Design a protein with these regions (language model features):
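N-terminal targeting/tethering segments
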Residues: 1-68
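PPIase-associated folding chaperone regions across multiple families
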Residues: 53-150
């Protein structure tokens, strides 16, 4: 069944770790392949009904297995990076001090350049830095799960 998701083994392990993390956070009830497939079918059915009613909706009319897996993995990541209410309630998303954000800005100054060689000010990119730091924290949580399963 996992072959229909078109992933190499390493990527599949990372996807399973993200599903487990989402389950641990209460974003999904079941991290199994069968449950993933069931959620995909439900989403496709929901989109079909919206399309029949002429309602506007965001995204494709039909999700293939690889598309839906990527949709869920992206959604879980965004729920952490831009903390959803559920993630906020759990208190698992880190907050960062101004000093930590400023340190990231100074160590990654090249990320904040513009076309003509000038740079965005720290204040202009502070929210972006917060998101990047939360992405790193999310990746570490996934990595911890992968290390535990080795």
């Amino acid at each position: 069944m996992k072959n229909k998701y078109c992933l190499y083994e390493k990527d599949w392990q990372k996807a399973k770790a993200a599903l487990l993390l989402a389950k641990n956070f209460g974003l999904i009830l079941d991290d199994s392949l069968e449950a993933l497939e069931e959620r995909r079918k439900e989403k496709n059915e929901e989109n079909r009904h919206k399309q029949e009613k002429g309602e506007l909706f965001y995204g494709p009319c039909f999700y293939t297995p690889p598309m839906y897996l990527q949709y869920e993995l992206t959604r879980f990541r965004l729920d952490f990076v831009q903390p959803s209410e559920k993630i906020k309630q759990l208190g698992v998303c880190p907050s960062f001090t101004r000093e930590e954000r400023l340190n990231f800005y100074e160590n990654n100054h090249d990320l904040f350049g513009r076309y003509h060689g000038d740079y965005f000010t720290f204040e202009d990119v502070e929210q972006i830095i917060d998101k990047r730091l939360r992405e790193e924290a999310y990746d570490k949580l996934i990595q911890n799960i992968l290390c535990q399963s080795d």
